[in-house]
Amino acid sequence: MAKTKAAAAKSEQKICVEGARVHNLKNVDVEIPRNSLTVITGLSGSGKSSLAFDTIYAEGQRRYIETFSAYARNFLGNMERPDVDKITGLSPVISIEQKTTNKNPRSTVGTTTEIYDFLRLLYARTAEAYSYISGEKMVRYTEEQIIGLLLSEYLGKRIILLAPLVKNRKGHYKELFENIRRKGYLYARIDGEMQEIVPEMKLDRYRNHSIEVVIDRLQVQDKDDKRLVQSVAIAMKQGEGEMLVCEMDTNEVRHYSKHLMCPTSGISYRDPAPHDFSFNSPQGACPRCKGLGFVHIIDRNKVIPDPTLSLKDGGFAPLGKAKQAMIFWQVEAVLEEYGCSIDTPLGEVPDEAIDEILEGSPERLRIPADKSKTTNDVYTEFGGLVKYIEQMRDADVGVAAQRWAEQFSGICECPECKSQRLRKESLHFLLDGKNIAEVSALELDQLYEWLEGLDKRISKRQQAIAAEITKEIKTRLKFLLDVGLDYLSLSRPSMSLSGGESQRIRLATQIGSQLVGVLYILDEPSIGLHQRDNIKLIRSLKALRDAGNTVLVVEHDREMMENADYIVDIGPLAGRRGGEVVFQGTYKEMLKKDTLTSKYLKGELSIDPPAEYRKGSGLSLTIRGASGHNLKNIDVEIPLGKLICITGVSGSGKSSLISETLYPILSKHFYRSLAEPLPYRAIEGLENIDKVIDVDQSPLGRTPRSNPATYTDVFTDIRKLFVELPEARIRGYKPGRFSFNVKGGRCETCGGNGYRTIEMNFLPDVFVPCEECRGKRYNRETLEVRFRGKSIADVLDMTINQAVEFFQNQPTILNKIKVLQEVGLGYIKLGQPSNTLSGGESQRVKLAAELARKDTGRTLYILDEPTTGLHFEDIRVLLEVLGKLVNKGNTIIVIEHNPDIIRSADWIIEMGPGGGHRGGEILYCGVPKESLLA
């Protein structure tokens, strides 16, 4: 009995997975020590994510959801049980993936980490209010204080006490005046002038008015003046806590309020609450931009993209070519007013005429009867093209119309809040001379320093209130600084973060939550990190482990493996030839084994730098004066015909320079893209390249119907081959017959999916093979057409390696699929759904498609972090592929920290020296140096 208990206790020290068969896993058994830092490594496509996320995490989440009632599960959705025999010792599990899922423009680093919530509380409780009109500090008074001030300032003087009822609002206020008369008041100060309130009195309803009722006229006597005390009380009640005093001899007016009030202008603020500092709350958001910080405006350059065209030829892009319609007649009428016609190129039309066409005509336009097909001339008002487009954009006329209008829109800074997102009242609450938007815009390390010294710069009352709040903010900030995110700010939009940054923010949030006994699963957290920042990350993961948690990391980073307590190596290769546990144990034990990973770690296999760096074409592309984000007005020369690596610490400006400045410039030039580049002065050398291609790791398509065969276009050639077969020709089949996306050849029972979805109310949806086609996707007649004994469905089910052998005598098809084999994807199937491919696999499919194309050798390729998800061996294959593209005369720019990529590049551009405001400079340009790898 004692032995059984001891064995059970020992097994509880491990997470045991038995018989895992998800995706390509081959009935694997794995033991992961609890309270350890464990790394799962292996080739791309070997089954790492299948084990970590699709087995362990999926089972943990499924068990959690099982704890809810059947009724609750109906709304939450149920997770399918992973294909595994048994998992024991499983703790509550939290997955921290590298996907940037938040596309909400309202989400920021501050809202995601909840630090901004504490900052809002700090400002609501300790900030001091200032007037947005006079800049003076706001004051508030009790009735006793007001009486004291009146006795000291107006003693012996004649004054009028007024209660404000209306402040700068439109209306005729007839009912208000009647109500005032019924209360016995006979005079009011209306728009600055004293007037008697007469029966049936009303004002111009379309003008703004200010109305203050006269409560009393009196001469201020000594401190026992009971009339003064009584009148002040009535004025404060009628004015809802506010009153005005007008000195009768000078007409000078002063404001008094029990609320926050400007003593000069009289404006008042309500008492601040945390929601007044939230740009996601109606109480705090800027009324113009609704808290977004930007507004949409119509871009004239998009409305008139080519000034050499006339109205007749479609010079105004929203209108297209001239046709019989009222808006064309209106534009033509404006042109004729200025002596132009529908044939005049818009570049030759006077600016005044263009302004009138865009902004609207001040006078009614005459449309001749012969055009409008009426008996008399028509006189019409013309609001302008800008108003026309805005109406289409803002009206509820359907998505297509709104998209049409948005193509002529641009985004610009909100003119009211200057991108600070909050209403002006909220922006005039200051703490240590800064408003909350200015504090949110500080980089995180600067914010930490500001909070550190805040105690010395605020009053004792503020210190007492702020102590606990600032302590909590600093604790959370420290976690963000520890994972190398010191260059971010709380105001940074979440949608602008890279996958690695998003993941590290979530990691810091989890460390801050101080949970214990949790299993954390992370997907390559070292992405986007310079070697310097990687040490901070490892330290944070160890802190998570030391707090009593189990940390499971899918990773290829050598340094991470060296610091791990336990390593699980999945292999031996990828796809069908992977899915096995080739090693599990400590790092030292791994070095004694003979796996592909251990050979790289021991140095038996390595990625050697080229013996000679490419000389390139001698031509270059130069950006001058790049100054977006933290770029410091830099000039960068990019030599063409080389493999170029852009490196530097996180936040140094690499993506700002390449992805947000260079790529949009080139995309706009070659493809008329609407994406606006960050500010720059000039670009030189555009004539030296023909096109630009951004090869990222996003999925090949949006649906499972997309696959490597369709993406590389080899499926078109395969369908053409099947159409030429005798059986297909006899039956009169066309290429569409062999597509599973259109009616005709596909199985209509499952719509060409190969499976049917059965909805289960209280259980997850079940996917069962289609009983009609048995998962083949096509109908029986289509499958009867065979090439060398194989149907179109059999071909799609082949791996790339099998397809290369099968199509040996079909050069058109062979050339395209051979490239997929060369980039190391021989194990995937031709028809494998794109949503089952990893990011690294998707990127290599895209590279293969590029390699297969006939190109001019003058293409510029941009790859951001291409080693994401790649093993040492995958990186070696990737470098071979990139080398082939460069050897054709193309140029490749890679944003990367991986030492093997840096060593293998022909040219290095290092940015820094730090992140954020300390970055944005070019530190080094030239061939790789060992100093860069330190």
In which residue ranges do the predicted regions lie?
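Conserved phosphate-binding elements of NTP-dependent enzyme cores
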Residues: M1-A934
